[in-house]
Amino acid sequence: LKKSKFISSIVIGFLTLGLLAGCGAQSTNKATSNDQKWELKAGHVAASSHPMNTELITMAKQIEEKTKGRVKISVFPEATLGGEREMLEGAKLGTMDIVLATTAVTGNFDPKMKIFDLPFLFKDREQAIKVLDGPIGQQLLDGMSSQGLVGLSFWENGFRNLTNSKRPIEKPADIKGLKIRTMENPIHLDAWKALGASPTPMAFAEVFTALQQGTIDGQENPLAIISTSRLYEVQKYVALTKHNYSPMVLIISKKVWDAFPDDIKAIFKEQAMSNAKVERQMLKEADEKYIADMKKFGTVITTPDTTPFREMVKPVYDKYSKDIGEDIIKQILDTK
């Protein structure tokens, strides 16, 4: 009996030590977490003068201040760290930290993101923002986690518009036969084919020279890209077709995210949303200036009635709605 009591005492002693050790480990980990510092890189492909770059730099400064220097973010515009697909692949692997990428490319990682490639999905900016900042937008951001990516918020690249060097665009027939540079995106390609154009996939870095040399007749991009990349210098005509609303997704590598303590995660979430709202407003105000500047340059700007365009691209919806999700498409179209 004495022997049994002795053994029990030893066991209890070891258990007590184990619990104390466990508590010590937790406090040590907590201290390490609070003391740890991160130096992160954030990349995107837009020009350094684009509002998204300006606001991303602001966000980096605010996060550094709020984390008391524990997180420092360096921002790299103009594809310095690679193209969007390359950067997202890096974020998935944990070799890249933060990426601000178009949904046209993020759709290759999560098919649900391809919904934004559908032409004429949104009537205006207000409808788009209501969707992106609501349950549908959050559902789409959450879907990135299965790819080793964390979607933080939707920023904005604006509505995509059509430019060309041949003629003003007033109706679908004016597009017929034009060689239009597009991204290598099947929905975009099918949409332009449905409108009678000859879509030509091409890396954006090659577009200015191709337009200058007449290899292609036109291209389509938001006004911010058309202006900050000075495409209007080699394009006589701009049609405000607003055929695609182009959100940007602020994404962080899940490997980086999982290493953050809760307080830093909360700061990132708060800043991701607040800075997105500022960037959108900056872009809205900038769009008016971009149009005025292009008119001064001599660019011919038209605002075609998009009703007949919408009719012509209905087969594109029929082709892709099943893969993307008929329910979510209907929810967006029904949003007022």
What are these regions (language model features)?
Residues 24-127, 136, 144-336:
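N-terminal secretory/targeting leader peptides
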Residues 1-39:
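Short, low-complexity disordered leader/linker segments with a strong preference
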